[in-house]
Amino acid sequence: MVKNQIFSLKSLWSSSIFKILYCYLFTSLLLILSTWVSVNDGLSVREHIILLRLYFDTNGTTWYHNQGWKEYADCILAADGSVRKALESIDPLTGQIPQYLWADHFSQLDNNKTLYKIIHNQIQGHKVVICNAFGITCEDRINLTGIDLSNNNLKGNITPYLPYLLHLRNLNLSNNHLSGCFPDGLLKAQSLVALDLSYNNISCTLSLADSKAISYIDISHNHLTGYFKNVWKTPNLLFLDLSFNKLYGTILKEFFRQKSLDYVNLSSNQLIGFLPILSKSRISYLNISNNRLIGNITLLTCWKAGSLRIFDAENNMFEGALPESIFDHSPLQYVNLKGNIVKDPLPSILDCAKSEVKIIVPDGLKQNKCDPKVSSNWVLILNPLGEEFNIVGSDFGINSKSINIQFQNGLHCVDNVTTIIKSNTIISCKNPQGRNSTYLKLTIPTGEPGNFTVIKQQLYYYRPIIKSCSKVYKNIGGEITILGSHLESFNKTSNGKKMITVSIGNIKNSFTNVTSSINSDGFSGEVISCRNADIITPDMITCSIPSNTNLQQPAEIQIIIDGITAYVPIDSTRPHFLYKGVYNKDITISKPTEYNQTITISVPNETIIDMDQVVRVLIDDNDDSICKNIQHINKTSIQCLPYSETCGSNVKVTLVTKYGEPQFTTSLNYPPPIITRVTQGIDSTSNSIITINGKFLKTGGKRNLSIKINDTICCPLYNEYYYKQDELDDDNNNNNNNNNNSTTDINNNNNIIKNNNLIKEEQILCYYQINQSLPIHLNLPVTLTLSNQTVVKNNIYSQTNSTCPNNCVKHRTNGCRSGICECYPNLTGPSCDENIPESTISNFSNYLPDFILSFPKFITNNTFNIKFLSISEVNESGNIVDRFCSLNNNNNNNNNNNNKNNNNNNNDSNNEKEVVEDEEEDLDYSSQNDNNNINNNNNENNNENKLNWKLINQTKTTNALYTLKIKKKNVTLDILISSDNNQHREVYFAGEVIQVPKSSIELIVNLKGKWLFKDPKNQLKFNFLVKPVNDHDYSLCLPSPFVLISDEPFRWITMDVDSSTIFAKPSNRFLLNNYLVRVIEPNYKLSDSNLTLNLYYQFNQTTLKQQDNHGDDNSDNSIKYTEDSLKFRIDFSTFNSRREINPKPRGCFKDNTHKFPYDYYIVFFGCASGLILVLVICIVQCSRIESRQRKQIIKSFKATQKMPVEIKTPLLPPSFHFNFLDYNNMDLNNNNNNNNNNNNNNNNNNNNNNNNNNNNNNNNNFNDGSDTFNNNNKKNLNYEDNCDTVGFDGKENDIKNINNKKDEKEDDGDDDDDEDDDEYEDDTQPCSSGNSSRSKGSDGGSSSNSLSSDKQSFNNGNENNSIIPENKKKHLTIINKK
């Protein structure tokens, strides 16, 4: 029992404890919440002070609507003098606080809890709510979010502190009389969303906009000046109006790149320059009127802005004609070009669209009238199933709703919808289904209200087309499927079936143009009608063939739908009906040793198959894959040539006879694939394209190819052919190239190469995707499976010595074969020696300066041919005045002209054809002015105008010097070609250091003598030809070059062909009579066939130093000459560029990795130098800003009294520095500052001076006698009988009461301290009403900071200084004073 009572008491006690704890926690939570609510119930101190500043700065008493503002201002100012001080501290007129300290100042205000309580208590006591005042919007009465005082008669300067309202989202002060400068930082406020200061008198410059929140800015109709700032970091800005200001400068393209910008008004300013690109902007309203912008009206990009609706450019300096495509891309509704120079006539589209678009142009311009027409050479062919079709013409207007299209049968476009694809020229609609219309009518408005033009246009429909037919067994029959297009019937018979008939047989005449049905008289032999013909889909028809038919093979197919005979192709793809074949093991086929080789098909005897009856041989049972050129040897054998893509093993061959079932075998076998080498090795850092070279790699267009590298699948891409030259001795090759050029005949049209030293080789490309989790090995096997034939190439990357793998790894490439290390890099330009392959130069011609650049054999066989074509004199218009061309000469010079005119130059016909095809104008040895008389000139005169090149000083196969004499101009032209470069090096030419890559070709052109110009304004032009001589079979896609010119400082010209790149780099300077002259950048031009590149180097009189003809008194002074020597340099080099996957149509691939060459060291050095320069600039700028701030602080707070001589007191504590921003340490309850420490009496000579003589270190100087200070120190002290004048200079902007601070803190709640304060106030002798004493430093530098709360008192009777404890200072002071 006792135990139970004890247990119950314990339980009661424990429950009571929990209840007490629970009540305690709940009470604490309530207190915390109430404290938080009381503290945050109201605006912050900064918001109150800035609102008061706004009210007083704009003369709030004169506002039209100031409900709640006057009561609010009077209530707060009546609270305490500290509020007025805080308000005066940010008075713009006095400027006590510098601008760069405003942010810190407002932060101190927000942290001043005493000032917040004073304002909060005063507002709650008078029940004043500023959030209810006119124009104020608050969020839960805590944050100020909106100020709208528009049209309210605000006068005076705009408050500069508005950017420091941290929660302000909307500010509207428009239509007032505000003046002053635009508040700095207002457009940087991160909370501001909408700003409207329009229709005021605000001046100065516009601050930088850097805010992610702002979306609306209207500062129009003010007096803003300065440069228009284009850097607007406002990604969400929608509306911007800066019109009617005084902004000047240009509009940069970055300004319109803001994605959200929709409305822009920059009218009535002083902007100059061009209108930036607007094609990618989303602006719908753009007003730039009354500025000084310039540009070509035709080329303005605003016509291509996809969202622009309003465009006002009145009173600018635009010039040009309005384009016909003005409405192609922009939905314009208003265009104003008045006050510009608009050329006439105006396009007709303006007349057609004047009812939809308002266009204002200068008066008196001619206008082309709107005359809708359909293009005469346009044929309208419709899909009977109904689909979108286009009508091409002119003057269709821009409003598709006003265009009506009606067909012959009375129907309109589907859904009666007409669309304008291209304004004024192309309209589109969807035709209804059927074939029962022969024309349509277009009704188009002419621009005048109520006037329309009706156009009748004939139309056609697509005929049904037969593409293929399935097979059935002869004796069994069955259902066949016929595939095609437009196989749809729209008419029905009386019994409700579709009107379709299918007939199969041998037809006497072709019925490809038959428009009506035919009877059995049109056939020969047996003719059947396919039963139960039905249209399954518009592309498929099915019908049934009866059994035991005996159709002659191959049989024709005839389909008639709605009385229209289906079209059957008449070429080799013509579809036929054939019976299904049966397997015959007795058929034998010879085994070909090469592709495209004739095969022999045989049977043991004619009873099995009579070979004379074979009419067709099918490969792979495909009607399109037939064996061509069938030759009947006898009744048991035939020969034929399989179609070009036949390859693989166990190929099916079907023999079709006139009558009887086709029979087939699968005994056609080509040799298995052979892998000779694998190039384009695996990259260890990214995916790669692997090239497999070999023989019998043809896939035949079938998906029967599988490639694996080790165990990873390499995705097959495509295969192609190229010609690989046998590995012959280099010397023999060079001799063959130089001595017997006629052995090689390249026909670019037929892709045929005739050379005994060239054999055919095949390639297969595959995409290898690396596995990051697996290491890269150099010794990987390749497994290739093609048409059930598998070949494995083990150790494809095997090495025979240690040097090879080291080099391969070093160069980040893989590949060695036959004991030869193949380290082939994937290059993007010349960078260093080890990454540059060894290109070779060959094929020097004896007749003209040319050479061939080629890659190493293991990379590619692509080559480039560079030739010097001509030297010309052209006039200002670019027309050729004199030209001397490099054509191949015959050994018999007397027959040169005849051979040229007849195009029968036998020795070098190929080169001559290349030059004639690549040059855009007819080439001639002589001047064009002499063309009319060339046939009348004798041989001597003809020889005088020819370029008879001579090849001299050819000591090596890689060097050649060409020279010629142009007798007519009395000049000599030398061209030096050299490729003897074994390393990447720098050469010095024409005062310039040129980077020359390894294995490059140097070409130096030297014109010696004085070139006689026919006109001093003419120019001298050198022409070079760059042509790819590729050995690939480009039947799939042509090797179209891609040309680019790099930026400074490299100035490379690149020409990409397939996987190869040639780099051409001219020197930046040239030598003119040993004087350095800046060269003009070369230009280029692709030929019409896009296969060759013409490089031009042109020199005019601004670069060529010219002089009069000396020594000839009778010479024409207008004729000028070049100097004695003109020399310039060009460097060529070839590189293999890395392949990447970028599919193009027809299976072609484009390499997008070509980059311009650069030197990594130069780039790195440039970046490092730039970074160091930026750091130095930042350090200097920061030092300047810090120095400027320090000077401003010193200037802002000048001391008004010099300091006395310091008395060093080692026992004193460190000095306390006064922070004028710290309002927490000020005594805000004492406005008169109780001058208890300033009771100096001139009659008392033994008075202690420790309370008045404070130095800069806050040390209290004690004077034990009357003669302590010398005369100089006495002069520095300004003692007066009246304490009102002691150290007071009358300036209101100085720091007040710095000697009279209290000892206790503001938040101390000690009652004893309050009593002590009362006693202290009663015993002190204050100065006259509210004036506070100030102490002036002895040096006039800084104000003394001796605070009464920090003051050190000393014992008068003791010579040793003793520090009084803080809690007894005031009591001791009171006792001493008493």
UniProtKB/Swiss-Prot annotation:
- Membrane topology category: Multi-pass membrane protein
> A cellular component term (GO) from this record?
membrane
According to the record, the signal peptide region is: none
Q: Where is the composition biased (Low complexity)?
A: 891-909, 929-945, 1227-1276, 1328-1353
Start and end residues of each stretch annotated as Disordered: 891-945, 1227-1378
Q: Which organism is it from?
A: Dictyostelium discoideum (Social amoeba)
Q: Which Cys pairs does UniProt list as disulfide-bonded?
A: none
Q: Where are the LRR repeats?
A: 143-165, 167-188, 191-212, 213-235, 236-257, 260-281, 282-304, 307-329, 331-353
Keywords associated with the record: Coiled coil, Glycoprotein, Leucine-rich repeat, Membrane, Repeat, Transmembrane, Transmembrane helix
Q: Where in the cell is it found?
A: Membrane
Kindly list any coiled-coil regions of this protein. 886-946
- Biased segments, Polar residues type: 1354-1364
Keyword Repressor set for record = no
Q: Where is the composition biased (Basic and acidic residues)?
A: 1289-1304
Q: What is this protein called?
A: S-cell enriched with leucine-rich repeat-containing protein slrA
Q: Where are the transmembrane segments?
A: 17-37, 1160-1180
Which residue stretches does the UniProt record annotate as biased composition, category Basic residues? 1368-1378
Instruction: Report if keyword Cytoplasm is assigned.
Output: no
Acidic residues composition bias: residue spans: 915-924, 1305-1324
Q: Which residues are glycosylated?
A: 59, 112, 143, 172, 201, 265, 287, 296, 416, 436, 451, 491, 513, 596, 605, 634, 704, 710, 740-741, 771, 788, 801, 826, 843, 861, 875, 907, 953, 970, 1090, 1100, 1331, 1360
